[in-house]
Design a protein with these regions (language model features):
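Membrane-proximal helix-turn-helix segments that form the acceptor-binding/catalytic region
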Residues: 28, 94-97, 101-104, 126, ...
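Carbohydrate-associated surface elements
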Residues: 184, 202-203
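Short N-terminal targeting/anchoring amphipathic segment
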Residues: 103-124, 134-140
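N-terminal subdomain of nucleotide-sugar transferases
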Residues: 1-65, 197, 243-249
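Conserved catalytic-core segment of nucleotide-activated headgroup transferases in glycan assembly
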Residues: 205-209, 216-269, 275-283
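A short, active-site helix/loop in glycosyltransferases that binds the activated sugar's phosphate group
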Residues: 44, 170-197
């Protein structure tokens, strides 16, 4: 079995772990791949603390600290941009070349067959195709978020951004296969870069719950669930305003918003019913969300998040799918979610920041038992289909060019 699996060198901004989403996805992939044939080269922030996963103790992991991953300006004016560009051109490029050499040595040591570049940081984009070219092996590229989004978030100056995005395109063109997360990303990367793409989205096992398609008892509160990082501030503020204006009631029943995540900041001078449960493991989060009536999936309406909203795909939808509960999607019409939702309607889609429209959508979902059951059933179908663990495994096998039965799954 192991002989048919390529010896993979994975280069990305995180090692496999149980912390952030990137760590979890890589961990789940390592757990199904022959452990003696996957090798991880992680370029992490200087303050990052590596916590190995016990089940993956035999996986060879090389941790390298990044420099100049985030931009800076010496002066807040055009001269400042030029100064930052000069610093990047010398210090950053020198450091990237050093990392490429280290990755090549690591790859040669382990007789690598293919390089899998996860283009999720400034550093990995700058490394691009160089490691694969030096090793003389095929290149696989993986894009979770569009570079236009996270390079701007990292305050990379416009000159370096332009150079890095050009580098990104060159890497995709030279890749044997490119894994993307959304239909919008797939369409544009094929058109703009001639990339050979495949959609690859994380999947998890659904919870076993016999009452998924039913609302909670009529004499109980309506619980709206939310898990993960909160960065869709305008959408969240709109939800809070809508519930406040409606006295935190839907269809005459009290509403509780259940929140899970490592950090959560909220303040209100009005009545609010928020249950903050802190950070929970994936399995805990799924069970707690499955006990909610509907789960909330917001995406930013802010123009500064345009690229992320259009091209990225929220991994929390895979988590929500595993619960079997319908979702209230709150996102602009140009988002990747809108295109996905038209094909997979699993609740209510609201593209407005008008509080009245939020209430109308939520009440439609929780007041119509037949509609609620239909949406719940569609969510169960999606959890066992498009966003299933099995489909994730199939997509990954196709991405790396191996047979599905090569993966170590039951």
């Amino acid at each position: 079995m192991q002989e048919s699996a390529s010896r993979l060198l994975v280069i990305g901004g995180s090692p496999p772990g149980s912390g952030c989403v990137a760590e979890i996805i890589l961990r789940d992939i390592c757990l199904i791949y022959p452990l003696s044939r996957i090798f991880c080269f992680a370029t992490v922030d200087p303050s990052y603390k590596f916590e190995p996963v016990q089940e993956l103790s035999s996986v060879q992991v090389c941790i390298q600290r990044t420099k100049h991953e985030h931009g800076y300006r010496a002066v807040g004016c055009p001269i400042g941009s030029l100064t930052a560009f000069a610093a990047s051109s010398f210090s950053f490029r020198w450091h990237v070349k050093k990392l490429v050499k280290e990755a090549v040595l690591f790859g040669r040591k382990h007789h690598i067959d293919k390089v899998w570049m996860i283009l999720d940081t400034t550093t990995t984009i700058a490394m691009g195709m160089d490691v694969a070219l030096e090793l003389g092996v095929p290149l696989l590229s993986n894009v979770w978020d569009p570079p236009e989004s996270f390079l701007q978030q990292r305050r990379i100056d416009r000159f370096s951004r332009s150079r890095l995005i050009k580098r990104f395109g060159e890497t995709l063109r030279l890749s044997e296969k490119v894994a993307v997360v959304s239909e919008s990303m797939q369409q544009d990367y094929e058109q703009n870069y001639g990339a050979n793409t495949i959609i690859m989205r994380h999947g998890i096992l659904p919870v076993q719950q016999s009452e998924k398609t039913k609302l909670s008892c009529i004499d109980k509160n309506i619980v709206i669930g939310f898990a993960g990082g909160l960065y869709a501030y305008s959408a969240w503020s709109c939800l809070m305003e809508a519930l406040t204006l409606n006295d935190w009631k839907l269809n005459g029943r009290n509403v509780i918003v259940r929140v899970m995540g490592a950090g959560f900041y909220f303040q209100s001078k009005e009545k609010a019913n928020i249950e903050y449960l802190g950070w929970r493991s994936m399995s805990e989060a799924v069970k707690l969300l499955a006990d909610c009536d509907v789960n909330y999936l917001p995406y930013p309406f802010e123009s500064s998040s345009y690229y992320m909203v259009k091209y990225a795909f929220p991994t929390k939808l895979s988590t929500y799918a595993a619960t079997g509960r319908p979702v209230f999607v709150h996102a602009p019409e140009y988002s990747s979610l809108h295109r996905f939702y038209k094909k997979h309607p699993v609740g209510i889609y609201c593209s407005s920041l008008e509080p009245s429209e939020v209430i109308t959508g939520l009440e439609k979902l929780v007041s119509n038992k037949e509609f609620y059951a239909e949406m719940s059933n569609k969510m169960v179908e999606m959890a066992n289909g498009e966003l299933s663990l099995e489909n994730f495994h199939k997509q990954f096998a196709e991405f790396v060019g191996i047979k599905r039965n090569t993966l170590l799954t039951k």
